[in-house]
């Protein structure tokens, strides 16, 4: 499982011009899956995202997590995180999980993220052509891979 986590002042996701998910201050999470991903990956990633200390404390030091900051999380599925550009100029998506595998993974990930966060996590529409808008705060942007936990 691979994610891009961005600290935002606001973020939204729209499908066909209609906003289907939005948050204020918090984290925008773009999530991609591969066939080998398991419940262990989902659990680890949900816990890691909620515990990341990406928000400033009263001293201006990034010591607070999204819960401490009273923030929200918006999750958007994004299979392109598993693109390979090693050969040629057209990305290959062969490492990305097929839709019938990745959709249940994404849904379970959002359920775990919501449970860890203690509130509902809005999402985009799986498999749809989506438009994501955000006000990146910092900017603070991280990439995290559950198979390479650095």
Curated annotation (Swiss-Prot):
E.C. designation(s): 3.1.1.96
Transmembrane segments: none
Pfam families for this protein: Tyr_Deacylase (PF02580)
Keywords carried by this UniProt record: Cytoplasm, Hydrolase, RNA-binding, tRNA-binding
Catalyzed reaction equations: glycyl-tRNA(Ala) + H2O = tRNA(Ala) + glycine + H(+); a D-aminoacyl-tRNA + H2O = a tRNA + a D-alpha-amino acid + H(+)
GO biological process: D-amino acid catabolic process
Gene Ontology terms: cellular component: cytoplasm
InterPro entries: Daa-tRNA_deacyls_DTD (IPR003732), DTD-like_sf (IPR023509)
Entry superkingdom: Bacteria
Keyword field contains tRNA-binding: yes
Entry GO MF terms: D-tyrosyl-tRNA(Tyr) deacylase activity; Gly-tRNA(Ala) deacylase activity; Ser(Gly)-tRNA(Ala) hydrolase activity; tRNA binding
Similarity annotation: Belongs to the DTD family.
Domain notes: A Gly-cisPro motif from one monomer fits into the active site of the other monomer to allow specific chiral rejection of L-amino acids.
Functional description taken from the UniProt entry: An aminoacyl-tRNA editing enzyme that deacylates mischarged D-aminoacyl-tRNAs. Also deacylates mischarged glycyl-tRNA(Ala), protecting cells against glycine mischarging by AlaRS. Acts via tRNA-based rather than protein-based catalysis; rejects L-amino acids rather than detecting D-amino acids in the active site. By recycling D-aminoacyl-tRNA to D-amino acids and free tRNA molecules, this enzyme counteracts the toxicity associated with the formation of D-aminoacyl-tRNA entities in vivo and helps enforce protein L-homochirality.
Family matches, as PANTHER family: D-AMINOACYL-TRNA DEACYLASE 1, D-TYROSYL-TRNA TYR DEACYLASE
Name of protein: D-aminoacyl-tRNA deacylase
Organism: Dechloromonas aromatica (strain RCB)
Gene field: dtd
